[in-house]
């Protein structure tokens, strides 16, 4: 790896031939680069053969880097700047600090060096350090360095915990060894002594700040080094242990009683896995990359040997392993800190600094440093129901469970058997955890982390730490499930009345809470298998719900909710809910207002539980409208959806709104529109189009174009209204104009008039998913107008915009195209499910226009990198596409448009 005698021999030879110091330094760099490249290649080759063997890799990189640093020091101090008789002040010691000092080097880790001098730095020492650094920089090493005296180290370490931590792991490399020993002694006697609590508090605050910045361990693009449950958390444990106990290896924590042998094995397993992932990240990217982004997850999973299997991609199996290891790191942290508290700390507990009002605890429990612990482990385990009761007691008292009690529970999960799962009292306790205390997520999350939830509901185990490899879901499946229950509990407590008025009013009026909570717990339990997760989940729910003690009627409702938990979301986001047929079909599926209310609340909780930014006013508006229309149909009968009756109501509302218009003009305006127009828009939009059409007629310009851009706050979007003379392909031209200005279309409706005009409304958002700022609207309007007038050709101008971001290329999004002639009385619905990209709607609309397809509406639903565009269409004769041959022809054209666009995007 690094043959020191051979390297020194080559350097001696080069020194004899070098004309000057600059030439010698160049020769040394060339020699070391050869060794570096050969060493890196050998390490990478060995790691590829054994992709989980992180320890040999980190040690090998440390050894290789040690060799280069020591050689650079030798060359700088003995050849480039030799001193025949150095004075007492002309001494220097080179120390590795931080991760390098610990001997843990990833392929592109920083090389942190401390140049230690006895007194103020001399000119000779400065020259040596400078020459050393130039050699290391020329080797493309990322060197972090500082030059200090021993006194400086003590002074700076007192005020800066980052410096103190780095020095905690110093390791002598080269130079004057007695100087390094002096630092070691003085750090212990002057800096570390009697400051343990201060150091621990600082490390915990640092950890909390890091976690706040990086997010939960369940976030699906975790930072392997800095994220929650990552390497830095494990390193923090080691730093604290070293600071207090002066340990050199983690194994020494076992005889000290801080870890059991089993916990130590867990530590080693987690550390080895996380280091392997980090090393692969560095090798894949060729730099110090710590964020496990989607594109890198695929590559790292492949390098580590994870393969696709039925229903799941290899990358999903890999990430499930990652999240499970991150969870174990969290458990180890809790155990370690609690042991430290018991042995060393006074005052408030380290894990829980919040004052809590004490409640009397039940017999068999005790309070240890503010946490709930077990008095007698044997007596506790004698009644296996205590493995559930402890979570109930923790919720009742508001206390955290002591890690010793957690250890006891985890070590005895085998007590949770079929007998216990079918025990009436066990069912009662479990349902009370969900329903009784107002914060079920606290119990569920801890039960999940300790394995109790999967032991009591074994069907839950496959989704624990399961990642869904897409950009839509921000959490693992189990954490998403818990987030949905958090949402329901918050709505129940009245905390979301303003943001979720409909769901809040439904719960206030009263629903079957037990059914809702159990349905949410089970709604995604079928994920990760080849079968549709809703169908499989319903079958699983049919087994689990009775076991949890639900009545036959409640079991049927839970099963129905799990089977159709996506129905309302799909109807609202993928279909035109102003079409009576959509509401009629949905009402037939739901059948009762009771089920409608339950499904509405479940849908809201589910969407909000997907991630921080998935819920918005647009989705809220769609769901509220679908709920209102469906409820009306269920209560008043399907005739309430009569198109003619609803049209008359809309016309009456417009007459009232245009009361200041001459009667003749109002009559003309109402007469010019076909029936679907009246249900497609609200009265405000009808007024806008009336004014725009009036303006067009008054202008006398046959090529006139009217554009209105207005904020639609209810929908978190900007409404873009267009009115002009109708001609073929107008919808695709407008879609192109909007794509060109970078607008994301979230909904679109197009209606022709009897007198030759077209009225189109597009709801658009900016690249961040927000309505456009008012100040941008005039400029936006001008740019759109230029495109519509042909001054800019959208097809050509869009070529440079068709780009897919690197991290999105990892996703495999197959294209599915379906034709639905039952979902609308008037139109064929073409549903295109494919990868989203800029300009996709325009490409699809242009392909349909070229095939003489009339597009009435386009409903757009986006799920991260995936989009579902639903087009309501007729042929040129106003008929549906019933012919399978015509459907196949259209599908071919649409697939061609998608493929060509994807190729453009990949090439750009």
Curated annotation (Swiss-Prot):
Q: Where is this region: Uridylyl-removing?
A: 361-718
Alphabetically, the GO molecular function entries are: [protein-PII] uridylyltransferase activity; phosphoric diester hydrolase activity
Q: Which residues form the ACT domain?
A: 719-801, 829-904
Q: Where is this region: Uridylyltransferase?
A: 1-360
Q: Where is the HD domain?
A: 477-599
Asked if Nucleotidyltransferase is a keyword of the record, the answer is yes
Catalytic activity as recorded in UniProt = [protein-PII]-L-tyrosine + UTP = [protein-PII]-uridylyl-L-tyrosine + diphosphate; [protein-PII]-uridylyl-L-tyrosine + H2O = [protein-PII]-L-tyrosine + UMP + H(+)
Question: Pfam families from the xrefs?
Answer: ACT_ACR9_3rd, GlnD_UR_UTase, HD
Q: Which SUPFAM superfamilies match?
A: ACT-like, Nucleotidyltransferase, Nucleotidyltransferase substrate binding subunit/domain, Poly A polymerase C-terminal region-like
| A GO BP entry | regulation of nitrogen utilization
What Enzyme Commission number does this protein have? 2.7.7.59, 3.1.4.-
Asked if the keyword Repeat belongs to this entry, the reply reads yes
Cite the entry's keywords alphabetically: Hydrolase, Magnesium, Multifunctional enzyme, Nucleotidyltransferase, Repeat, Transferase
Please summarize the record's notes on activators and inhibitors of this protein: Uridylyltransferase (UTase) activity is inhibited by glutamine, while glutamine activates uridylyl-removing (UR) activity.
Q: Matching InterPro entries, A to Z? A: ACT-like_dom_sf (IPR045865), ACT_dom (IPR002912), HD/PDEase_dom (IPR003607), HD_domain (IPR006674), NT_sf (IPR043519), PII_UdlTrfase/GS_AdlTrfase (IPR013546), UTase/UR (IPR010043)
So which cofactors does this thing need?
A: Mg(2+)
HAMAP family xref list: PII_uridylyl_transf
Q: What does this protein do?
A: Modifies, by uridylylation and deuridylylation, the PII regulatory proteins (GlnB and homologs), in response to the nitrogen status of the cell that GlnD senses through the glutamine level. Under low glutamine levels, catalyzes the conversion of the PII proteins and UTP to PII-UMP and PPi, while under higher glutamine levels, GlnD hydrolyzes PII-UMP to PII and UMP (deuridylylation). Thus, controls uridylylation state and activity of the PII proteins, and plays an important role in the regulation of nitrogen assimilation and metabolism.
Q: Which family does it belong to?
A: Belongs to the GlnD family.
Any domain commentary?
Has four distinct domains: an N-terminal nucleotidyltransferase (NT) domain responsible for UTase activity, a central HD domain that encodes UR activity, and two C-terminal ACT domains that seem to have a role in glutamine sensing.
Protein's recorded name:
Bifunctional uridylyltransferase/uridylyl-removing enzyme
Organism of this sequence = Ruegeria pomeroyi (strain ATCC 700808 / DSM 15171 / DSS-3)
Q: Tell me the organism's taxonomic lineage.
A: Bacteria, Pseudomonadati, Pseudomonadota, Alphaproteobacteria, Rhodobacterales
Q: Which gene encodes it?
A: glnD
């Amino acid at each position: 790896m690094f043959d020191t005698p051979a390297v020194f021999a080559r350097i001696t030879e080069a020194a004899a031939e070098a004309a000057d110091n600059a030439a010698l330094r160049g020769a040394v760099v060339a020699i070391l680069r050869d060794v570096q490249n050969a060493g890196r290649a050998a390490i990478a080759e060995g790691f590829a053969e054994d992709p989980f063997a992180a320890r040999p890799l980190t040690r090998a990189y440390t050894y290789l880097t040690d060799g280069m640093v020591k050689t650079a020091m030798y060359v700088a101090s003995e050849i480039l700047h030799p001193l025949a008789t150095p004075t007492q002040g002309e001494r220097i010691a080179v120390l590795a600090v931080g991760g390098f000092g610990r001997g843990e080097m990833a392929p592109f880790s920083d090389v942190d060096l401390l140049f230690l001098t006895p007194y103020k730095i001399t000119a000779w020492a400065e020259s040596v350090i400078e020459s050393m650094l130039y050699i290391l920089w020329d080797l493309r090493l990322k060197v972090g360095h500082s030059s200090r005296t021993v006194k400086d180290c003590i002074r700076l370490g007192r005020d800066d915990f980052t410096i103190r931590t780095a020095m905690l792991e110093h390791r002598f490399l080269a130079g004057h060894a007695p100087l390094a020993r002096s630092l070691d002694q003085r750090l212990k006697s002057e800096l570390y002594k009697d400051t343990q609590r201060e150091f621990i508090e600082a490390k915990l605050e640092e950890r909390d700040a890091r976690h706040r910045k990086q997010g939960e361990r369940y976030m699906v693009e975790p930072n392997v080094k800095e994220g929650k449950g990552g390497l830095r958390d494990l390193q923090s444990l080691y730093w604290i242990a070293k600071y207090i106990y002066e340990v050199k290896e983690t194994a020494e924590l076992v005889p000290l009683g801080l870890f059991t042998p089993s916990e130590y094995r867990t530590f080693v397993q987690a550390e080895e896995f996380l280091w392997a992932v980090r090393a692969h990240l560095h090798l894949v990217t060729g730099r110090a990359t710590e964020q496990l982004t989607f594109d890198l997850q695929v590559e790292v999973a492949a390098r580590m040997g994870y393969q696709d299997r039925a229903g799941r991609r290899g990358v999903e199996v890999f990430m499930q392993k990652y999240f499970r290891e991150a969870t174990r790191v969290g458990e180890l942290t809790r155990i370690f800190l609690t042991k430290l508290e018991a042995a060393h700390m006074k005052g408030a507990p380290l894990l829980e600094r919040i004052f809590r009002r004490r409640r009397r605890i039940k017999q068999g429990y005790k309070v240890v440093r503010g946490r709930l612990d077990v008095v007698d482990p044997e007596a506790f385990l004698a009644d296996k129901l205590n493995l559930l009761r402890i979570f109930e007691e923790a919720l009742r008292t508001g206390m955290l469970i002591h890690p010793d009690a957690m250890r006891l529970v985890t070590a005895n999960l085998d007590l949770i058997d079929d007998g216990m799962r079918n025990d009436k009292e066990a069912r009662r306790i479990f349902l009370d955890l969900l329903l009784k205390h107002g914060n079920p997520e606290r119990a569920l999350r801890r039960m999940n982390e300790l394995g109790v939830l999967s032991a009591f509901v074994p069907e839950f185990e496959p989704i624990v730490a399961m990642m869904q490899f897409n950009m839509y879901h921000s959490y693992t499946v189990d954490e998403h499930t818990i987030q949905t229950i958090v949402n329901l509990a918050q709505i129940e407590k009245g905390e979301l009345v303003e943001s979720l008025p409909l769901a809040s009013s439904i719960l206030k009026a009263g629903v079957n809470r037990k059914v809702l909570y159990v349905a949410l717990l089970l709604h995604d339990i079928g994920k990760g298998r080849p079968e549709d997760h809703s169908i499989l989940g319903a079958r699983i729910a049919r087994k689990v719900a009775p076991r949890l003690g639900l009545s036959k009627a409640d079991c049927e409702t839970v099963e129905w909710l799990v089977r159709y938990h996506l129905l309302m979301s799909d109807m609202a986001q993928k279909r035109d809910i102003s079409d009576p047929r959509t509401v009629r079909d949905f009402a037939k599926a739901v059948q009762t207002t009771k089920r409608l209310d339950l499904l509405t609340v479940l849908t809201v909780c589910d969407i909000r539980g997907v991630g921080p930014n998935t819920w918005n006013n647009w989705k809220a508006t769609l769901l509220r409208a679908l709920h209102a229309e469906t409820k009306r149909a269920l209560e008043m009968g399907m005739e309430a959806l009569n198109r003619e009756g609803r049209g008359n109501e809309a016309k009456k509302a417009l007459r009232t709104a245009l009361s200041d218009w001459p009667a003749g003009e109002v009559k003309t305006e109402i007469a010019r529109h076909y029936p679907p127009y009246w249900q497609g828009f609200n009265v405000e939009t009808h007024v806008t189009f009336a004014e725009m059409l009036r303006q067009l007629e008054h202008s006398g310009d046959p090529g006139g174009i009217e554009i209105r851009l207005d904020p639609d706050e209810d929908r978190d979007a900007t409404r873009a209204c267009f009115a002009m003379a109708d001609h073929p392909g107008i919808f695709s031209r407008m879609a192109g104009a909007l794509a060109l200005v970078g607008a994301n279309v979230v909904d679109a409706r197009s209606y022709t008039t009897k007198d030759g005009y077209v009225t189109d409304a597009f709801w658009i958002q900016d690249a961040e998913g927000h309505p456009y700022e008012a100040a941008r609207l005039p400029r936006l309007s001008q740019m759109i107008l230029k495109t519509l007038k042909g001054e800019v050709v959208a097809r050509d101008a869009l070529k440079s915009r068709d780009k897919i971001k690197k991290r999105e290329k990892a996703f495999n999004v197959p294209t599915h195209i379906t034709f639905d002639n039952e979902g609308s009385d008037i139109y064929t619905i073409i549903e295109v499910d494919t990868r989203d990209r800029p300009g996709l709607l325009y490409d699809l609309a242009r392909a349909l226009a070229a095939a003489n397809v009339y597009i009435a509406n386009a409903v757009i639903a986006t799920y991260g990198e995936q989009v579902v565009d639903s087009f309501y269409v007729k042929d040129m004769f106003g008929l549906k596409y019933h012919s399978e041959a015509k459907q196949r022809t259209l599908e071919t054209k649409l697939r061609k448009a998608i493929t060509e666009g994807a190729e453009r995007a990949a090439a750009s």
